[in-house]
Amino acid sequence: MSQPGFACAVPEADLRSTIRRVVAAVVLILLAVTPVLAKAKPPFVAEIVSSAADQVTGGDARLHIVVPRITPLQQVEVLVNGVNQADRFTPIAGTETLTGVIDGLVLGENTVVVKQHGNGNGLPEPAILTLTNHPITGPVFSGPHQNPFMCSIQNYGLGQPLVDNPTEGFPVYEVDPYGNPTDVIIGYSMNCSADTLVTYLYQDTDGNFKPYVPGDPRPADMAQTTTMDGLTVDYIVRWERGTINRFLYSIAMLAPFDEGPDDLDTSAWNGKVIYHFQGGVAIGHYQGGPSTSRMLYETGLSRGYAVLYSTGNKTGTHYNLVLGGETALMVKERFVELYDLPVYTVSLGGSGGGIQQYIYGQNHKGLLDAAIPQYSYPDMVTQAVHVGDCELLEFYMDVLDAGNPRWQTWSNRTLVEGLFASDTVSNPYTGTVGATECVMGWRGLAPLALNPVYGAAPGMELYEPLSAVAAIHWTHFDDIRNYVGIGADGYARNYWDNVGVQYGLSAVASGQITPEEFLQLNAVIGGWKQEPDMVQEGSPFYPGSWDPWSARNQIFSVDPLSAPAPRREGDLDAMQAAYESGLVFRGDIDIPVIDWRHYLEAELDMHNTHQSFASRQRIRDFRGDSDNQLIWFTDALGGAQFDQTPEALEVMDEWMMNILANPELGVAGNKPALAVDRCFDTFGTEMAAGDDVWDGILDTDPPGACTAMFPIYGTSRIVAGGTFK
């Protein structure tokens, strides 16, 4: 009988027979297809190793390509925007991986397809990469360039900058037949670019570097060096310099055998890289002056390390550590394009160079594999907070409360400043003995960071138009304006704040100052003026009346007893931006760290010892432990003497090689015997070592052996009830 929706009914027996036939047919099809599936080739695997895929610069990139074993190498195609560049690739010995550098990338997105020649079925699946290319002048992610920007390469052997426009920037002059600049301007440069320069040097037997031409007869005074791999070679260095991200960069490496600039000799390279950062304090608008001793870091070169450096990674050029991190990534990218991936990259650098290591280790995983920060601080942002208190407090004790005999004993100033003070150190500002770290270490930093009309940059009188130079706001906050933003007054938002700070709180609580002194201090001390209200500094920073405290830019009260002096309120958006942009070290670092410094408290040096432990506390707060960070102090009675850095490099090398050999054990599980907290005497001899030598600083345990020998001090904000970190 017919059923609705069907033309006719199907007998049940016939239906079962039909199902059996269909199932059998499907099984036969699967059996026929299975051998084909089993024989399917593994895919190509392609990886960019010189940078992140979206952070390529300069139009080229190094790739590693894993080729399926059954694919003949001569059939590999590397199509860069459709153009085959397979001839740029060579096998890595002992692997199925090809390495090579592609070029000709256009600005913006580029497509790279790695495949086997042909279009037939059964070929390996291609690898497809999308690479985003940026100019070698930057930026990549740091935001709009800072302008005006004064060039410096003409002072450091790289010639005049390349002309990039006809009307604005740093002038470029016509040269005479002898190569000397004339007075005739042929154009201007805003990017301060230079052609890449490769030269060769040799070290003589007196330890000096001299020019060398590969292939020339061997100089009689040429020294030799033995690398950490035990290879003894002539001390000849290949030295490449140029500009990346508008800053001067340097790559140096031993090259003991004859080579040309494009024929790289890696025979004496130990496979490892030192990235040498540098400190100082500056606020940008300048290409920077390089340090030859860091570019040609003898301890590293002689042992076979490659040494990387950039004026963009010198905080004496600028303190925009987003820009600095970008620059370091770009310089390392250039190195990897030249030489391929290193075994590891370890960083060195003191003061601001130490800050960079903590910040970049946090923000750019993979840039650094190990760090040796020297004389470090956690970051610039939180350091600036208590440093901004220094001159407010010094002016109060020198002038506003000058009649109080307590402050005439200079060591008493530690009670409110937290930083060390001495009754015996000569004070150049008073002509007598007695000084503080605020005076000897930090004087002049407040106007440099805060005063928009105080700063300057070398060569700014040459820049066109001069009206652009006159419009610069010379502050640290304007240096990082891309992140903190611009306020309604037209100035960069400023995070510095002292509203509600109870200066001297722990001192009054412990009875070291009286309640009356505490109340008067907090009523009279004010803060810093808003940027539009600031005026030019006085002597000794600028011609004028004596004002080492920058008091003319402080806020006071006409009658502090009835109306306390107003404080400076920081911008909340700027505070948030400092964290979000990565300018604050939060403790997010997982690489091995040896934090080393000379103990310089008696010198009233700005590199105070509490900073190493501030970083440690942040690491503990973020990670739960600080097993990856070691703290080493070397005594410096009478001034810095023994350099512990070579030993730190040796310990770090053993630590890193353990990690590479046993990655499953992690950073802490691979520590060699000497990778512990330690302290040393002035001759570099170990005084104490172990996990407990710094007890009593970040805990309530009895002082450890090193703690007892090297007292740690605080800051004005710690005295006021703030945290140690």
Residue ranges, per PLM feature:
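N-terminal secretory signal peptides that target proteins for export/translocation
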Residues: 1-19
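Bacterial N-terminal signal peptides
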Residues: 22-34
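Intrinsic disorder/low-complexity segments in short proteins, especially the signal peptide
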Residues: 11, 33-36
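C-terminal His-loop and adjacent cap/lid subdomain of alpha/beta-hydrolase
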Residues: 39-725
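Residue-level detector of alpha-helical hydrophobic segments embedded in or interacting with membranes
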Residues: 6, 30, 37-38, 130
